[in-house]
């Protein structure tokens, strides 16, 4: 993995993007990511660091209509999940999101899938309005929505950091999560952990 030489200081123009930490992706949900609960403490630590720095905190969420094109009931690859205004679409109760968290809903059109937090959303415009230049990506699933969000961030000109201790993948087939992170690094992202950030 590639790590920055010097420790990073979180700035007010940085954004933490927490991807899809919703009930349906947790144990007991419709589409659980293995061990997804294990990253919640790390994500909460990052939230504290970003709040202290007066940086931006974003939480993306799948926000599907009941007959979404991705559902296997319509020939898609996934069981119905994260349906609008249901328990499964809610953020997990242990996630300590600040009151001013920017919530970005994605994949809300019945006939269009969207893995990235940037696709068909106001995320890019919102970040630019706040002067954000660096994004730090956490959440699930590494090979899908985390990867797609990071890829779009790179394409849009942001400096992208993958928070390795705060992402979790499906990892099927085995090794797919590591390949996804390595692919992002090859494209210009930087993989870091919480110890790589200055806590002051």
For every predicted segment, state its role:
Residues 2-17, 29, 35, 41-54, ...:
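Active-site-adjacent betaalpha module
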Residues 22-28:
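Short acidic, Gly/Ser-rich segments with clustered Asp/Glu that frequently serve as metal-coordination loops
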Residues 25, 66-67:
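Feature marks short, surface-exposed loop/turn motifs that line or immediately flank catalytic pockets
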Residues 61:
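Catalytic-core segment of enzymes that process non-peptidic bonds
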Residues 69-73:
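Short aromatic-enriched loop/helix-cap "lid" or pocket-rim segments at secondary-structure transitions
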């Amino acid at each position: 993995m590639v790590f920055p030489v010097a420790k990073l200081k979180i700035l007010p123009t940085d954004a933490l993007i927490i991807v899809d930490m919703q009930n349906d992706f947790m144990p007991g949900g419709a589409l659980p990511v293995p061990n997804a609960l294990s990253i919640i403490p790390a994500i909460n630590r990052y939230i504290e660091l970003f709040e202290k720095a007066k940086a931006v905190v974003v939480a993306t969420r799948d926000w599907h209509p009941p007959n979404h094109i991705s559902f296997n009931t319509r020939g898609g690859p996934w069981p119905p999940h994260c349906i609008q205004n249901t328990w499964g679409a809610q953020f997990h109760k242990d996630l300590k999101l600040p009151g001013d968290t920017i919530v970005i809903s994605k994949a809300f059109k019945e006939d269009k899938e969207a893995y990235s937090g940037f696709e068909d959303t106001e995320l890019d415009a919102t970040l630019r309005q706040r002067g954000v230049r660096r994004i730090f990506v956490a959440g699930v699933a590494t090979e899908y929505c985390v990867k797609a969000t990071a890829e779009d961030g790179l394409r849009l000109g942001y400096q992208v950091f993958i928070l390795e201790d705060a992402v979790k993948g499906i990892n099927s087939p085995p090794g797919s999560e590591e390949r996804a992170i390595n692919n992002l690094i090859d494209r210009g992202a930087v993989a870091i952990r919480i110890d790589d950030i200055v806590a002051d």
